[in-house]
Amino acid sequence: MHKNGITHRDLKPENVLYDNVFNLKIADFGFAAPIIGRDGSGSCKTKLGTESYMAPEIHLRKPYNGASVDLFACGIILFITMTQHPPFTKAVQDDPFYRLLMANRADLFWKAHSKNKPEGFFSEDFKNLITSMLAFDPSQRPSMADIKAHAWYKGEVVTLDDIQAEFA
């Protein structure tokens, strides 16, 4: 999508679908825009999307990079996929969990989220990836190429046969 010059701006679990052989499909492009912004400035400016998946720069009504805000939302989706709950309510100063990330206290963020989880539930690679994807400063967030090169992404891959066996 980004390679085609499009930013989604409303990525959330409800908009991530799978076909019958578990290929990922993205749905609902109602808020999509050119990744360089509608005015060609290189930035998007409108506050659109589902608030709990919005990057902080959107909440702050700053011009934003479409790819960066989409990857921020992907970090939230990935966290939910792993834990079955979001990492925070909204990426704003008032949210205690997001405030920890803003203050560079990822250690406390992960300590809080590790309560009631088995020891080692979150791998260091997973924590590193999610922390970077949810960075307050969009220039500190990884690109898709960075994510694909990340150790967590390159880890063990579940095969289609594994998935189908799980649902059999």
Language-model segments: what does each one mean?
Residues K45-I58:
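Conserved activation segment of eukaryotic-like protein kinases, specifically the C-terminal portion
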Residues T81-M82:
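Hydrophobic anchor on a C-lobe helix of Hanks-type protein kinase catalytic domains
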Residues P86-A135:
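C-terminal lobe of the eukaryotic/viral protein kinase catalytic domain
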Residues A135-Q140, M144-L160:
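Terminal C-lobe "cap" of eukaryotic-type protein kinase domains
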